[in-house]
Every structure is written in structure tokens, then in C-alpha cells.
Amino acid sequence: MSHISDLLRNHGVDLSWQESLYQDLHEHPELSGFETETSRTILSQLNRFDCEVISPVGGYGVIAIFRNGDHENHPVALMRADFDGLPVKETTGVPWASTRIRPLDGTNVPVMHACGHDMHTTALLGACALLDERRDAWQGTFIALFQPSEENARGANAMIADGLAQKIPRPDVCFSQHVVPGPAGAVMSRPGAALAACDSIDIRIRGRSAHGSMPHNSIDPTYVAAMIVVRLQGIVGREVSPEEFAVISVGTLQSGNSNNTIPSEARLVLNCRFYNDKVKKRIYRAIERVVKGECMASGIEHEPVIEYFAHGELTDNDVDVFAKVRPVFDEVFGPESVTADRWTASEDFPNIPLALNSPYLYWTIGATPAGDWARAVAADRVAQDVPANHMGDFLPDFEPTVKSATTAAAAAVLTYLGVRSHRKV
């Protein structure tokens, strides 16, 4: 058994407080950009540790820097956790379920930790406690970075814009993790592309309005938008190789507000995902061709407005970091350390190591009760029977999930900072 595996199985650190913390975070979620209470809770927890705390960073971001031993001659490792919630109505029925209603874009919405960011925060604070108490096991610098506003893809860039690189030592390696559907406690990692890159595309079509009884006097943007939606479905199926991955989803389609008026404008908002730039460029050329072609075919007199926004970088795990950390995961978790499938979701985490010029590894943690997962797999009903991220009934199985998430965070950091790790060269 390696020294890391032995330490993490017998660390002797009391982490029983994690459950009450998790339930408090879960019951009191906050939307992206409004994480005042959560930030205060994190700061309160960090007060227990021997670390330098920097806050606020990029809004409500919090950074804790732990230095130990001959830290100037040993590596710097950063572990990140996000902590914002979602405008989702909770249906879990647990005593600590969120009942919060908060304003968003002019309307009141329910708020829930439907993506597990409460678990990410709890686990990273647990890793902080473990590494703070077991300073005999490591040397170097450990940075715990708590990031707000992941769900709107603004938090990482906000921290970067607020001088993140000048506030912390440059990490030799960065880590992050995410809970997902899967057997609770499983630690799933892979080299290379792990999460998709993404963009959103806002398309506005300006036609000509007319009374509903006189469609011949109009240039109907609703009809044009409908034709665009239909034609978009053929791009992935007919212009992208089956060996490649791409998604084009129409998430918003808006036009008019009266049943007897043909409107003057229609709006579509697309979400696109991919694993490489070659595919991205191909589908974007095709989208613009389809939009402009349908407008031309219908006699639209105005050039369509096509705007790209909410870009998410590809999460592309460094192969050397993976090769170093994965054997440690295998030894610490045994059969629960498995190879991850690529995840088609996207993250803003890569912006941080890219800005810091650091290699990184991002892995996932299974959060579904083991029995529920096994039954769903056996019945080929995972999509139907297993609650997934962003659903109102998504609730990680606490004990195995928090244990693996806390341990994985500490294991990855100790791979670089453990007392038997290599010095900087």
C-alpha cells in the first residue's frame, strides 16, 4: 500500500461535520452572481484552518492558500470547487430540501442545488481539513479555490479578470471534480477530452409584419425560423462524420405575441457542443449557411443577426497529469476507480488553468445510490429512472459520495505534494 493510500484510509481526521454543512448548503442555495451567504459560510469554515484567505475575488470567489514545510522548493497544487445553485424547483422531499424563491430576470424562481455544487464545496472543505491537520504528510503549497457563478459560465473569467494570477502562486497543476449519475462513490477519470466545448448562438431574423388575415403582405419570420429549425437537424446527421461528436440544440424559439398578427421578428438561441475545433468550424459554417439560405429563400430583406456568446472551453485533461494521478486513484479506490466516458456537458473550469498556464485534471464522482444504479442499468432505464444533474430530484447519496469526493481531492493534491513527491526542478 502506498503512503498516500495508507494515509487516506487511516488519516484520523474528524470529518463528521461535513454532513450538517452539506445539508445547510443544500437548503440555502443561491443563484449565480448572488452567492453572498454561501461565500460567508465558506469563509467561516476556513477560519478554522492555518491558511491565507483571499476574498472577494471575481465577485464572491474565495481562495485559501495552505503553505507547509519547505514550500518554496516543492510544487503548488490547486483544487477548485464551484458553489452556485440553479433556478430549479426541488422535488427530493428531504427535510433539508430548498424552498427558496428568488428574483431572476424580472420574475421569481425556485432555487436549488440541482447540480451538486454543495457537494463539491463540502468535499473541498473536507480536503482542506484533512491536509491542514495532516501536515506531516506533505510539503509545498495547496490552493483551495472556491468559484462562484459556474452555471452562467462567468465565474472563472470573473476571478481571472480580478487578478487571480497575481493573487496566488502559479500552480504546477490544477484539479477539479463534479458529481454525476453513476454508482455512488465511483471515481471516474480519463486522459484527453473529458467534457465538451460549447457556444451559444443568438439568431435574429427580421421579416415584415402583417395582419394575420393577409399573410401575402408579410415576410413571415416565424415560418423562416421554423424552416431553420428543421434544416439544422440535418447538419449533424449529414455533415458531421459518425465518428465525430457534435450537438446542435434549439433552446429558444420566439416570435410574436398575438394570434392574429404575423410578427416582424423571430429569435432562435442555439446551444452547440463539440470536442474539437475542426468540427466546431464545420458546424458553424453550416449553421450560418442554413440561416442565410432560408432568409434568402423567403425573400427576407435584412441580413440575419448571428451572435456567438457563452463560450465554454474544451475540458482536455493533461495526459501526463492523468498518468501520475490515475495510479493513485486506482490504489486508493480499488475497483471504484474507473475510466470515465466523455461527458457532453461543459464547464468553465478550464479557463482557470489556461489563464495560469497550468496542466490540469478533471474527474467525476458517481452520486447515485448503488442499488438504484444497478437496477436502472439492468433494466436499460438509466435515462428514465436515474435523476440527473439539473433535475429537481437530483440528490447525491451523501455518505459514499462525499467520502470519495473528499478523498479524491486530497489524493490528487498529495500525488504532487506528498512527502515522497519530487521537488521542483
Name each model-derived stretch:
Residues 1-113, 118, 122-126, 130-139:
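Acidic/His- and Gly-rich active-site-bordering loop/insert found
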